[in-house]
Each structure stands twice: as C-alpha cells, then as structure tokens.
Amino acid sequence: MPLHEIAFWLAILAVLPGALGIWLSGIAADWLVRRSPKGRLWVASGSLALLIPFEIAYALAGSPGLALAMSAITHFLGGAYLAPTIAFAHSQVTPRQRASASAVLLLGLNLIGLGIGPMLVGLLSDAATAQGFGTAGLRYALLAIIPSQFVALALFLRANAIDAPPLPSSKE
C-alpha cells in the first residue's frame, strides 16, 4: 500500500473511531454513574486497560492492514477516557468551579497528550533511526511511551479507590 494511502486511512481511522469512542464512553459513563458514583472512573479505567494491549499490537503490526485495524481500535479506546474524565472532574467541583476545572484538565491533557507526547515519539523515533534501527525506529518509539499508559491507568485505579463523597453543591 503506498504511503499516501496509508496516511489517508490513518487519518480516517483516527477521527471516526476516536469520536465514536468519546461519544459511546459518555453514554456508558452516564449509565454506570446511576448505579455507582464511580461509574465514570470505571469507564475511563476500563478503556485504558483495554487500550494497552492494542497499542502494543499496533506498534508491532506486521502488515499495513493489521496496523490500520489496530489504529482504529486504539483511537476508539484512546478517546474513550475523555468524556468520563471531564464529567468526573465536573462532578467533583461546584458549578462555579467547572470552567476552572475544565481549563486545568484540558491544559494538562493538551500539554502532555498533544504537546509532549508526539514530540517525544518523534525524538525517540529519530534517535532510534540514527542508532541503526531504520524504519523500525517509529515502532520502538511507540512502544517506549506505553509505560505512560500504565501510569495513567494506575492513577485512574487510585482515584477509583478513594472513598470521598461527592460535593453536595455539585448536584444540578
């Protein structure tokens, strides 16, 4: 498959499954939170736990077709933590604090996820390529950042373990 076709399909398979993951995880989180106050965190934790093996499979895919399939799954699961995380953050603050909570959360997500993450993958890929790994440098760079997903999962699981009641004023 030519590079321009792979790029086209990677773009499509990032946007559509990512948006679907955000939307469906929001629906699942809304349903689960009626059964348990931790329902939103369960969805975020579950999506991250499921994401890790698919990220590994994506990085190690031996064919463009498999890589594209894994890309779709990783973008679906990679977006699935977002809606429950934002909803959870809003449930932990008063209505007057929601804009600030959103600003802090989105600043962190964008600085790390959209700023540092891609830059780090690029730097690691360039370094691996310069060390003689050739085109496999990107594969190793993608694998090298997977431990950050374990950190995120551990933090979500820790948040699940906290038994703090919601703020009384956070109810609408």
Where would I find each of the regions flagged by the language model?
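A membrane-interface helix-boundary motif in multi-pass transporters
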Residues: 39-42, 123-147
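C-terminal transmembrane helical hairpin of 12-TM major facilitator-type secondary transporters
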Residues: 37-85
